[in-house]
């Protein structure tokens, strides 16, 4: 018997169950600024990677990329994008609390706009990101601050989901 879909997984599957790529297929601009960290031989983890635009880009630069997302639909689209671009990415369906945060495994961990985690989940997530980094590794993090609420241009509307 299949495991029942969790409520968050269902929400994200519904969001990603569309033919187009919600955020496009080009990498996040902030991540592109960090291009030098994704050279061949670097082991990279993309957390909550969505439809794969960032993981595919990093793999195209030669990085050895693992990526996970809670949404099966997002991972399916990520795998399709990787195949279209001719790159290899190790994709997994997982939530941040279910992921196997192996100690000192990655040179780079990327967390881009994981804004819907509760403060407690975010504390666990960030601790696990540090745990899974090799000594001297790099955590690349991008998220909204409380100032974003004034702009009303996207992101979460819950203050506790914003980074301080």
What do the PLM-derived regions correspond to, one by one?
Residues 1-39, 147:
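Conserved class I S-adenosyl-L-methionine
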Residues 51-63:
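Conserved SAM-binding loop of SAM-dependent methyltransferases across substrates and taxa
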Residues 71-73:
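Conserved SAM/SAH-binding beta-strand->alpha-helix loop
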Residues 85-97:
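Conserved SAM-binding strand-loop segment of SAM-dependent methyltransferases
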Residues 99-108:
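A short acidic, Gly/Pro-enriched loop at the edge of an enzyme's catalytic core
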Residues 116-129:
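A short, conserved alpha-helix within the catalytic core of class I
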Residues 136-144:
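Conserved beta-strand signature within the Rossmann-like core of class I S-adenosyl-L-methionine
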Residues 141, 148-164:
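Acceptor-substrate binding/catalytic loop of class I
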């Amino acid at each position: 018997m299949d495991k029942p879909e969790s409520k968050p997984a269902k929400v994200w599957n519904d969001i990603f169950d569309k033919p187009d790529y919600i955020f496009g297929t080009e990498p996040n601009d902030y991540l592109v600024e960090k291009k030098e960290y994704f050279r061949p031989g670097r082991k990279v983890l993309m957390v909550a990677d969505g439809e794969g635009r960032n993981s595919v880009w990093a793999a195209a630069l030669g990085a050895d990329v693992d990526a996970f997302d809670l949404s099966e639909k997002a991972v399916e689209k990520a795998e399709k994008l990787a195949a279209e671009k001719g790159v290899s990415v190790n994709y997994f369906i997982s939530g941040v609390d279910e992921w196997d945060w192996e100690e000192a495994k990655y040179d780079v961990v990327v967390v881009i706009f994981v804004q819907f985690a509760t403060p407690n989940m975010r504390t666990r997530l960030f601790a696990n990101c540090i745990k899974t980094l090799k000594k001297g590794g790099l955590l690349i993090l991008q998220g909204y601050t409380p100032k974003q609420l004034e702009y009303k241009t996207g992101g979460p509307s819950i203050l506790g989901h914003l980074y301080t």
